[in-house]
From Swiss-Prot:
UniProt subcellular location: Mitochondrion
The keyword Zinc-finger is assigned to this record: no
Organism: Mus musculus
Protein name, entry field: Uncharacterized protein C14orf119 homolog
GO CC field: cytosol; mitochondrion
Keyword Signal annotated: no
Pfam families linked: DUF4508
Keywords: Mitochondrion
UniProt cross-references to InterPro entries, sorted A to Z: DUF4508
Main location: mitochondrion
Domain of life: Eukaryota
Length: 142
């Protein structure tokens, strides 16, 4: 059962009964984030707090690859992390968390992705500084 109604739009044949909002006000603030998206972000931030240094580094590489999707170097770095010996064992909790992270992130709008980085920066400013440095380091690389 969905918590949000999918039938909130007014059919085009009915005139709008809502007052119009000036464009400068409507565009100044992003639409509110969905409850589900905010809960997904909370989960990731909670998991992040318990990750080890190497796990955070792996997450950093993934975050950079998502922030700079057209660049080849982050993809090569991520491939380097894969291990053929891992194919015979079930995934660990961290790997499951990364899979959920990937699935959720792909469903977020750009403003929600930016909000996630902002929230992460509040709790982990040093990590986000490393993220920004890593993104900047991809400039000019293919």
């Amino acid at each position: 059962m969905s918590l949000e109604s999918s039938s909130t739009s007014v059919p085009p044949c009915f005139p709008s009964v809502l007052p119009s909002v000036p464009d400068d006000i409507a565009s100044s603030s992003p639409p509110p984030m969905s409850y589900i998206t905010s809960q997904e972000m909370k989960c990731i931030l909670y998991w992040f707090a318990s990750w080890s240094g190497p796990q955070r580094e792996r997450f950093l590489q993934d975050l950079v690859a998502k922030a700079v999707p057209g660049k080849l170097q982050p993809l090569l770095d991520a491939l380097e992390q894969l291990s053929m010996s891992a194919a015979n064992r079930p995934p660990c909790i961290f790997e499951c968390q990364l899979r959920l992270w990937d699935q959720w992130f792909r469903g977020w709008a750009e403003q929600e992705r930016n909000e996630f980085v902002r929230q992460l920066e509040v709790s982990e400013p040093d990590f986000v500084a490393k993220f920004y440095q890593a993104v900047a380091a991809t400039a000019g690389k293919d």
